[in-house]
């Protein structure tokens, strides 16, 4: 395990330097940690170096200061790139990670050569839905929402085939720091990357799950239309966590895009 201090708070990361000219930076979804990418990484490590990390208040990373916005999450990601001397990367983000990725590219375009956005939109949800979720988690804990989350994350066929894995991801969310989870909810609630997305010029791939109820395909398509020449792909039958729910197709799309 590797750790680094950023603004007096620890970030957990994993960097595999394969002596490649290409580096993949992965940014996780709400309530998860870097382990969600394990199987994808196994398929992509032959194509480049791998950098994964835990967002603030997730996994083994410390909580952020109050009022931590998505721009702050992006800046701590830049801090990692800077301190690991990674000059440029292909950034892959899912859900909130798919909002952080364009922000990073906008603020530090010299560091991002390609963007892959999965299950994200220029605006996810609205204030009412996020405030309701925040209130529920504060009052009843993360266990009160994980059953419904798993149904949104994974298709019935995946759940039937891999019940133990779904149970493991449920445990992952339930063990997330509640304040870290709420801080991320607030950051998503308060962010709209519409104008940022219009400034991006690097090659971009936007991937949607056809059955995604968290971020419907229309939202992902709208984001792709904001980014110059972005490519839009749908994984049929997939729910929100495309990188797990349909890992093989997901990885094939990435490999085709980076070649």
Where are these regions (language model features)?
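Flexible "cap/lid" loop of the alpha/beta hydrolase fold
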Residues: 99-107, 112-144
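Active-site loop/oxyanion-hole signature of alpha/beta-hydrolase fold enzymes
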Residues: 38-42, 51-92, 252
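Conserved alpha/beta-hydrolase "acid-adjacent" motif
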Residues: 213-219
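Catalytic histidine-centered segment of alpha/beta-hydrolase-like enzymes
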Residues: 238-247, 251
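Catalytic histidine neighborhood in serine/cysteine hydrolases
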Residues: 221-241
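Conserved HGGG/HGGXW glycine-rich cap/lid loop of the alpha/beta-hydrolase fold
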Residues: 9-62
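Short beta-strand/loop motif that positions the catalytic acidic residue
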Residues: 200, 206-208, 212
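Conserved alpha/beta-hydrolase catalytic His-Asp/Glu region
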Residues: 125-128, 140-198
